[in-house]
């Protein structure tokens, strides 16, 4: 199954996901370039990383958003978006031993359409655009060594779930996305590694 099929089979958690699912399916169906960042609306992924106790999450201090944030990035043509999420996790934090929790079609944990304001990146202006974002849930060990990715973030740390809300300076992401992820997490059995 591809991402279109995964999103089509995904059961929305709330009204935001129902509305965003429609937008994502239209883009995935109608825009062959949506996996490339050249498209005005393009596929991205995030990975919400928690410890085995589901009490802590791993966050990075994102330079563009000037906020503590979840981890993620662009598909950049790669249609195996779960592998992109794990790659971004390793690139942005150094964490290499996370496991994705299979909690939905294609292991999707959440989906959202995110607005991105115009900004500077690597000395060039990037116009405002949309991220067609899918989120994966992963489990990692807080004892695994972490590191920053200096061109993207200036900090990496594990925080208590409720602290993820207070340390984010992005009101919409905090109130609409992080709260949703925390609420959904309470209903997910993350299992134990064997």
Give the role of each language-model region.
Residues 30, 39, 71, 107, ...:
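Glycine-rich, flexible loop/turn motifs
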Residues 9-46:
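Acidic, metal-coordinating catalytic segment for phosphate/diphosphate chemistry
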Residues 35-70:
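N-terminal strand-loop-strand
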Residues 1-11:
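Generic N-terminal amphipathic, Lys/Arg-enriched alpha-helix
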Residues 1, 32-42, 126-135:
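Short charge-dense sequence patches
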């Amino acid at each position: 199954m591809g991402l279109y099929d995964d999103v089509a089979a995904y059961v929305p958690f709330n009204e935001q996901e129902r509305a965003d699912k429609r937008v994502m399916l239209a883009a995935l169906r109608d825009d062959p370039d949506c996996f490339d960042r050249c498209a005005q609306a393009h596929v991205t992924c995030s990975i919400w990383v928690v410890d085995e106790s589901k009490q802590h999450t791993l966050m990075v201090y994102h330079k563009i958003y000037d906020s503590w944030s979840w981890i993620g990035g662009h598909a950049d043509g790669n249609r195996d978006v779960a592998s992109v999420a794990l790659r971004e996790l390793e690139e942005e934090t150094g964490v290499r031993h996370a496991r994705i929790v299979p909690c939905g079609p294609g292991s999707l944990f959440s989906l959202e359409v995110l607005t991105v304001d115009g900004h500077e990146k690597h000395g060039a202006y990037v116009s405002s655009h949309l991220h067609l974002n899918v989120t994966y849930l992963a489990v990692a060990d807080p004892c695994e060594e972490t590191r920053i990715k200096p061109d993207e973030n200036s900090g990496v740390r594990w925080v208590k779930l409720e602290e993820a809300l207070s340390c984010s300076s992005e009101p919409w992401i905090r109130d609409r996305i992080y709260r949703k992820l925390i609420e959904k997490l309470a209903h997910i059995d993350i299992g134990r590694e064997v």
